Amino acid sequence: MAHASAELPPAPPEAKRWRDLRKRALSAAVLGPLALAAIWLGAHWYTLMIALGIAILAWEWVHLCGLRVRAFPGLAVPLALFASGLAAVADLHLLALLLLPAGAAAATLAARSDPRRAPGASTLWLGAGVVYIGLAGIGFIWLRSDSFAGLVAILFVVLVVWASDIGAYMVGRMVGGPKLAPAISPNKTWSGALGGLAAAVLVGLAVAAWADAEARLASVAVIAAILGTAAAAGDLLESAIKRHFHVKDSSGLIPGHGGLLDRVDGLLAAIPVACAIALVQGSARGGHGFLWT
């Protein structure tokens, strides 16, 4: 007869996956509409969302690097990002960009000179995080600063990246097949990558059709494919970073998702690419928020 204290057998892998999926869906159902509302409202609501997101990402990044946020070397990262963000909000975008390498160097030097630093702490990665997170933060602010075109551009990028992520996850689960990069992320498949790319293009076309009746759909499809590819690359990059630090998630902040960094890795890569596209395309339409001509 089994003892009362005997442990229950572990849940089957499939049951665990469905529990995780329910958690992911619930978290997305709460956070997604809040993010979209802040994007739509713009102004202080949007700036507050970006500031809060950057602060959380800085905290997660410092912990990934094996440092404490409350000690000065770790505090240098959010301070550098805060200074760069203030410059971006004030439309001093060149200054905001210049503050990133300066902040990265300051964070790295501060960490290296700290006698209390843990032996395994990574000082170079600490500085790299300032640029990695800061570029996306500046991009979010710059791209949204043009009223209607900025709103459309941010919605386009966010929805395309979300579609890429969801499409890759669902198609990869249903179809499976050859692995995309088994040494970096064993669960990602080529079928998932292609499914994510197709979803990104379809959603991009839908957003463009809603926002601009004169949009050239071929151009929109190419831009959506580029952003979807950038998002997938950002996902792989974050997987490689977590593998380097031997962690599964950047934090446990979001149930079913891990940390904020785990959820916005695609956006961190796609936003700078979108800004580069907007710089080129916007010059043809007299505004920096346009992603297509």
Could you describe each region identified by the protein language model?
Residues 204, 208, 274-278, 282:
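Juxtamembrane/transmembrane-helix interface segments of polytopic membrane transporters
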Residues 226-237:
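Hydrophobic alpha-helical transmembrane segments of multi-pass membrane transport proteins
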Residues 2-226:
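Membrane-embedded alpha-helical bundles of polytopic integral membrane proteins
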Residues 237-253:
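Interfacial helix-loop-helix junctions of multi-pass membrane proteins
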Residues 278-293:
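Juxtamembrane boundary at the C-terminal end of a transmembrane helix
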Residues 187-194, 252-267:
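Divalent-cation-assisted or electrostatically stabilized phosphate/pyrophosphate-binding catalytic cores
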Residues 263-279:
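Final/C-terminal transmembrane alpha-helix of multipass membrane proteins
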